[in-house]
């Protein structure tokens, strides 16, 4: 399935929210007025200098941006090839990239006069970021989280509760991220008058994929500036993990029209691509889920299959529609890493860099381990260190039999 090559890879979506054959808005009739209101409010906010100035102020003084671009010297020496930089999104307030997007959406919710915020969460980082900003701005917060994820991400559940959020366990389906998103959408339909749905990734109906991408693009814009200061030129390659894909899109988007920059997205191969996994590009086909058309894990009857990853944040049977399009037009190379490869990369990063990475970016780091040794020493590679791994220590210890 090939989409025509565009003049610019950065111009999408069209006015109906399509990236080539992907995206759009497939939603219940009751939600359509909300979606259109949101689109209008975002279009107005985007060109309002006061909105931008307020957001920049919060990003600097509350989130702690810009996040550093860090030369991973010992990992670079260990692999003996490309010069590796980490974009340290793990150092943001709340410990991941999620807060960049949540800040923008919560500011939009306030602008729209919505006092109640709902969110879905997998690894808990989007839930924590949402609970954090609801506390800061005095808004009611309800977070939907799969029961399986509640068990494996307990530290984040406690953080959300400490911040005043109500955490609602979801027991339907596989009780993970997809199911949490289903429940959040149901709640939104029921409470349209006062509720804003803060989606955590570049998925959902238009304008969410575009809006989340725009709020996360601060990552890539900072990298452009920082790498020019450090190296005097653009990087040769970018690499990031992909579940829905917001951290990756935030890094990739500002570089899409730079043909000299190779771009790699890393999906979760779970137990392997022939077994249980969460690699929608590698093992999926086009379909509709959560309001947009994209690559999905489906059976022969078109039913959504359960995804699996050791990482709760990548455990989703779809991918953002813009990523699906970028795959089809050949601009982004999609790879996948297994649970075991991610665990090995996790341990390596801890021991060589003194950085405990989240299991999500550990998948990207696993592919750095494959790519970097084959590249020349002057090749500049930037990995998005999208979150810190405190939340994963119990899960990692369990998988490693307690032996770090």
Curated annotation (Swiss-Prot):
One Pfam family matching this protein: PALP
Quaternary organization: Tetramer of two alpha and two beta chains.
This protein's pathway: Amino-acid biosynthesis; L-tryptophan biosynthesis; L-tryptophan from chorismate: step 5/5
Domain of life: Bacteria
GO cellular component labels: cytoplasm
Keyword Ion transport assigned: no
Enzymatic reactions: (1S,2R)-1-C-(indol-3-yl)glycerol 3-phosphate + L-serine = D-glyceraldehyde 3-phosphate + L-tryptophan + H2O
Database matches in InterPro entries: Trp_synth_b_CS, Trp_synth_beta, Trp_synth_beta/beta-like, TrpB-like_PALP, TrpB-like_PALP_sf
Alphabetic keyword roster: Amino-acid biosynthesis, Aromatic amino acid biosynthesis, Lyase, Pyridoxal phosphate, Tryptophan biosynthesis
EC number(s) recorded for this UniProt protein: 4.2.1.20
Residues recorded with modification N6-(pyridoxal phosphate)lysine: 98
One example GO MF annotation: tryptophan synthase activity
Family: Belongs to the TrpB family.
SUPFAM superfamilies, per database record: Tryptophan synthase beta subunit-like PLP-dependent enzymes
Protein name, as recorded: Tryptophan synthase beta chain
């Amino acid at each position: 399935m090939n989409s025509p090559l565009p003049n610019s890879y950065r111009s999408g979506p069209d006015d109906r929210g399509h990236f080539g054959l992907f995206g759009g808005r497939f939603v219940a009739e009751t939600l359509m007025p909300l979606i259109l209101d949101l689109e209008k409010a975002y279009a107005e906010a985007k060109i309002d200098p006061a909105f931008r100035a307020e957001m920049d102020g919060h990003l600097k003084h509350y989130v702690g941006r810009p996040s550093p671009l860090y030369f991973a010297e010992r990992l670079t020496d260990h692999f003996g090839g490309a010069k590796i930089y980490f974009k340290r999104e793990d150092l943001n307030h709340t410990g991941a990239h999620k807060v960049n997007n949540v800040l923008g959406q919560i500011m939009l919710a306030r602008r729209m006069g919505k006092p109640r915020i709902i969110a879905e969460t997998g690894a808990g980082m989007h839930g924590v970021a949402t609970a954090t900003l609801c506390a800061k701005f005095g808004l009611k917060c309800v977070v939907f989280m799969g029961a399986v994820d509640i068990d494996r991400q307990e530290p984040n559940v406690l953080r959300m509760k400490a911040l005043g959020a109500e955490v609602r366990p979801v027991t339907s389906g596989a009780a993970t991220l997809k199911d949490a998103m289903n429940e959040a959408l149901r709640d939104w339909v029921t409470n349209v008058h006062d509720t804003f749905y803060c989606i955590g990734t570049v998925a959902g109906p238009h304008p969410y994929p575009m809006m989340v991408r725009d709020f996360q693009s601060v990552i890539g814009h900072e990298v452009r500036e920082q790498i020019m200061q450090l190296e005097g030129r653009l990087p040769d390659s970018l690499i990031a993990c992909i579940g829905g894909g917001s951290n990756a899109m935030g890094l990739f988007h500002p570089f899409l029209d730079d043909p000299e920059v190779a771009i790699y997205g890393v999906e979760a191969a779970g137990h392997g691509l022939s077994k249980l996994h969460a690699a929608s590009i590698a093992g999926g086909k086009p379909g509709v889920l959560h309001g947009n058309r994209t690559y999905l894990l489906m059976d022969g009857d078109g039913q959504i299959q359960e995804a699996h990853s050791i990482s709760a944040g990548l455990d989703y049977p779809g991918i953002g529609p813009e990523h699906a399009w970028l795959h089809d037009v050949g601009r982004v190379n999609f790879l996948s890493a297994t649970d075991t490869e991610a665990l090995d990369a996790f341990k390596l990063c801890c021991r060589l860099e003194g950085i405990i990475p989240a299991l999500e970016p550990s998948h990207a780091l696993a592919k750095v381990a494959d790519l970097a040794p084959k590249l020349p020493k002057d090749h500049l590679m930037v990995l998005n260190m999208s979150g810190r791994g405190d939340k994963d220590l119990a899960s990692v210890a369990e998988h490693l039999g307690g032996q770090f």
